[in-house]
Design a protein with these regions (language model features):
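Compositionally biased regions
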Residues: 3-4, 18-20, 24
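Bacterial N-terminal signal peptides
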Residues: 11-19
């Protein structure tokens, strides 16, 4: 984007899906159900950003931490602030790894490179500095805190790790823009407490090509991340 852009989107809030593979493989989900609710009008403002795909910063495997309470991760994006409550007690390994990536500035100036917006699912995927869908740190870690529910197990606002198979978590994660049912293969590590409307508006504006899966039409970049 070359100038500040205001987005107004009518966003469908609830979806159902089955067997969606959310990872660095650009495989589109198969629609299995129609939208069942409407959330109304969403408006956000996105500023110009110089962020672009780049080589990942080399980061060693972070040390495991012991947490007495949840952490708060704030994504400062060109479209506004997204605040995430990180489930440090339910997903201590994941939050430890993310803490290391955040403090190492691994995510700074990275683009949210992929979205899905279909009758099956609505999500925004981020966390790959290369913006190719194949980037990540030099380490991987195991799954944890997988959902037990069979339906609507990834509600709107859920933040979970993307992967390429069991126990292959790295840095990429996705934020659910609508209530969705997925196979329970993706570590849930947080929920958005502020700024979900940003994700919803970006997702509702679709992909650059107009297809259900691909690079967002609206460029959204994580310019800086903090954790406390």
């Amino acid at each position: 984007m070359n100038s500040t852009k205001k987005l107004t989107a009518i966003f469908t809030a609830a979806f159902l899906s089955s067997g969606i593979f959310v990872s660095n493989v650009n495989a589109a989900p198969k629609p299995t159900a129609k939208p069942v609710a409407n959330n109304g009008e969403v408006q956000i403002t996105c500023k110009p950003t110089k962020a672009t795909g780049h080589r990942e910063k080399k980061v060693g495997t972070p040390k495991l931490q012991k947490f007495s309470k949840n952490r708060v991760i704030t994504l400062n994006t060109n479209c506004g602030e997204i605040v995430i409550e990180a489930f440090a007690k339910k997903a201590p390994v994941t939050v430890s790894m993310l803490s290391g990536l955040v403090t190492s500035k691994f995510y700074d100036q990275s683009i949210c490179h992929r979205l899905i917006y279909s009758q099956s699912a609505a999500l925004l995927q981020c966390g790959d500095p290369t913006a190719s869908g194949y980037g990540g740190p030099q380490f991987q870690f195991n799954d944890e805190n997988l959902p037990k529910a069979a339906m609507n197990n990834y509600p709107a606002g859920t933040v979970a790790m993307a992967n390429s198979g069991p126990n292959t978590n790295g840095s990429q994660f996705f934020i659910m823009a609508a209530n969705t049912t997925l196979d329970p293969y993706y570590t849930v590590w947080g929920r958005v407490t502020k700024g979900l409307e940003i994700v919803q508006a970006v997702v509702a504006n679709g992909t650059a090509t107009g297809e259900e899966v691909g690079q967002p039409k609206v460029k959204i970049a994580i310019e800086k991340v903090s954790i406390r």
